[in-house]
């Protein structure tokens, strides 16, 4: 079965290419993804049963939906494996316009769905698509193409800073109109990271970081609900029943779990004490039920994905596949930063912000997009191996099954 999948991925029928198709695809990422999907489904089930019973009179409502989306996500992962990355590279400009269209569409009354004053979803038949999740992937696809095409000019101010930051600003404005400050920060960090590894001049980043801090401060000052979150973050225990309530309850979960946890399913905070226990604050539930040791193991799994993505990017650079290199770097920055923010929010290191824990938190859009993204990453690695074997069969990848 695996051999047939490899053969299908190669898109070749000659005897020589069939031999090359036997090169191992990165099974480690596949196993890690499946492991996180299963673990996430178990934790969502544990964290959501009480809330689901109260909201829908069915304790497995969120669990069933999460399992359903996980199955679809696996098919999307396989679909991404079948698409050559050159297709993204050739049409990267089109992905920018697609991103603008969906970001504008969600703001149109009757098209976008408003929940608690935020208009972030486009309802489809079986799922509400959170367009910010799609925008993260589309932004990485687009900026990878832009940087790869202008790589010799990236040391120039116009091509290296002015143009990409202007385009990023357009995306940020549309995201902030939803409003979705968290996704704006994630995309900005990914793009800035990609610009940095492209060889941009370091001194420009001081100006960029300063400008972004000033803008972030202004956004907090002019927005009462953001100021409310900052107050709760700085003084959570003084506002334990107000703006700091969610953070205090999350920290109580960490305290209850200790090093080894209270046991799977035995958490207390998910029982109406901790809001959004199955989504943004599922990390606290994990810490309460399997302990800090279990959470550290989970963090190591995420670090494996991040460093594996960086290694894939490095190999793509060595093979002069610059688009694929920046694509892989962007994916590594995305996953790494989002995990960092989610855990930071749950532990009180960062202000409360609605970002999911990749592949674990409840949410169809996040699950589907992330699995498709990992499929792209594995595809990049597979193409790297085929090209390396074509250049020199003894070059790095020697594992060919006889």
Swiss-Prot record:
The encoding gene: ftsW
Topological domain ranges for the Cytoplasmic compartment: 1-24, 85-91, 143-160, 203, 306-324, 379-402
Keyword line: Cell cycle, Cell division, Cell inner membrane, Cell membrane, Cell shape, Cell wall biogenesis/degradation, Glycosyltransferase, Membrane, Peptidoglycan synthesis, Transferase, Transmembrane, Transmembrane helix
Pathway(s) of this molecule: Cell wall biogenesis; peptidoglycan biosynthesis
Keyword rRNA-binding: no
Family: Belongs to the SEDS family. FtsW subfamily.
Organism: Francisella salina
Keyword Iron-sulfur attributed: no
UniProt superkingdom: Bacteria
Main location: membrane
Gene Ontology biological-process annotations: cell wall organization; FtsZ-dependent cytokinesis; peptidoglycan biosynthetic process; regulation of cell shape
Name of the protein in question: Probable peptidoglycan glycosyltransferase FtsW
Subcellular location, record wording: Cell inner membrane
């Amino acid at each position: 079965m695996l051999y047939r999948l490899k053969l299908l991925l190669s898109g070749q029928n000659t005897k020589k290419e069939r031999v090359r198709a036997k090169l191992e695809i990165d099974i480690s990422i596949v196993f890690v993804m499946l492991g996180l999907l299963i673990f996430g489904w178990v934790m969502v089930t544990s964290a959501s049963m009480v809330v689901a019973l109260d909201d829908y009179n069915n304790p497995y409502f969120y669990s069933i939906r999460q399992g359903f989306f996980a199955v679809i996500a696996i098919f999307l992962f396989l679909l991404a494996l079948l698409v050559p990355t050159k297709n993204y590279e050739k049409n990267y400009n089109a992905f920018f316009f697609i991103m603008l269209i969906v970001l504008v569409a969600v703001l149109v009354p009757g098209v976008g769905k408003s929940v608690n004053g935020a208009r972030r979803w486009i309802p489809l038949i079986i799922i509400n698509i959170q367009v910010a999740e799609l925008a993260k992937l589309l932004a990485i696809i687009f900026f990878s193409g832009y940087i790869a095409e202008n790589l010799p000019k990236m040391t120039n101010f116009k091509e290296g800073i002015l143009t990409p930051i202007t385009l990023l600003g357009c995306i940020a404005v549309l995201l902030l109109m939803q409003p979705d400050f968290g996704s704006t920060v994630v995309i900005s960090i990914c793009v800035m990271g990609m610009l940095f590894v492209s060889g941009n001049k370091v001194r420009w980043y001081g100006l960029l970081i300063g400008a972004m801090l000033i803008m972030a401060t202004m956004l907090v000052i002019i927005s009462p609900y953001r100021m409310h979150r900052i107050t709760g973050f700085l003084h959570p225990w003084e506002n334990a029943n107000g703006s700091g309530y969610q953070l205090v309850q999350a920290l109580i979960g960490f305290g209850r779990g200790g090093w080894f946890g209270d046991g799977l399913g035995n958490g207390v905070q998910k029982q109406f004490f901790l809001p959004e226990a199955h989504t943004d604050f599922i990390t606290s539930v994990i810490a309460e039920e399997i302990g800090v040791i279990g959470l550290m193991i989970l963090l190591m799994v995420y670090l494996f994905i991040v460093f594996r993505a960086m290694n894939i990017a490095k190999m793509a650079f060595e093979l002069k596949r610059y688009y694929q290199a920046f694509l892989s770097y962007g994916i590594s920055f995305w996953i790494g930063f989002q995990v960092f923010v989610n855990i930071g929010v749950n532990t009180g290191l960062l202000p409360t912000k609605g970002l999911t824990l990749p592949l674990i938190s409840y949410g169809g859009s996040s699950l589907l997009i992330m699995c498709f993204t990992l499929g792209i990453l594995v595809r990049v690695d597979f193409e790297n191996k085929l090209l390396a074997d074509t250049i020199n069969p003894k070059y790095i990848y020697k594992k060919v099954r006889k």
